Amino acid sequence: MRLDVVTIFPEYLEPLRAALLGKAIDKGLISVEVHDLRDWTHDVHKAVDDSPYGGGPGMVMKPTVWGPALDDVLAAGDGDTDTLLVVPTPAGVPFTQATAERWAGEKRIVFACGRYEGIDQRVFDDAARRVRVEEVSIGDYVLIGGEAAVLVMTEAFVRLIPGVLGNQQSHQEDSFSDGLLEGPSYTRPATWRGLDVPPVLLSGDHAKVAAWRREQSLQRTAERRPDLLP
């Protein structure tokens, strides 16, 4: 898989090359290219934004910069039809575990990181003539820009690519993998600061352990995310 990120803060995306994601790059499972949007500006101030039509607060990122940037970045791929353009925005559809699972099968994803009041909508309308475009939100809150959302989403779907995790069963038992939250986890020692590991986990009875985990998962989901239950 190839990942491209267009941003005015390339340094923000350095964590993409660290830890598990860095190992995926080393294994050749993914490649990452980060592009500085200001490379496509033509004025001495390298301006990427302008006042919004219709008035209002803030600034809007210019199509005359974003358009050429995406033209060049998309052209660098093996074929536009295999590319997914993702726009992180609080006005987008919710990013979920199902989204992550779907994206893990993509050949190429390009992220367009907005700032200020966002990017001129015509940029995405134009791009949609050539590639698939998804505007996606990671939650009902507003960030300063799209970069943090890119880091969150990338970690969520890259870990699902076969070969990235040492144990593929790890993500199969995650929260949301079966529509429920994952229950509590424990490791050695069996007693710590007067707190004991639930005896069933020490029993060696796999059926009882599985039943206990299911019960804990249902209980936690009911308490914290009842909206996930039927």
From Swiss-Prot:
One of its GO terms (biological process) is tRNA N1-guanine methylation. Signal peptide: none annotated. GO terms for molecular function: tRNA (guanine(37)-N1)-methyltransferase activity. Its EC number is 2.1.1.228. CDD domains: TrmD-like. It comes from the Bacteria. It is found in: Cytoplasm. It holds the Pfam family tRNA_m1G_MT. S-adenosyl-L-methionine binds at residues 114, 138-143. It catalyses: guanosine(37) in tRNA + S-adenosyl-L-methionine = N(1)-methylguanosine(37) in tRNA + S-adenosyl-L-homocysteine + H(+). GO terms for cellular component: cytosol. Keywords: Cytoplasm, Methyltransferase, S-adenosyl-L-methionine, Transferase, tRNA processing. NCBIfam families: PRK00026.1 (NF000648), trmD (TIGR00088). Belongs to the RNA methyltransferase TrmD family. Specifically methylates guanosine-37 in various tRNAs. HAMAP family: TrmD (MF_00605). PANTHER family: TRNA (GUANINE-N(1)-)-METHYLTRANSFERASE. Homodimer. This is tRNA (guanine-N(1)-)-methyltransferase. The gene is trmD.
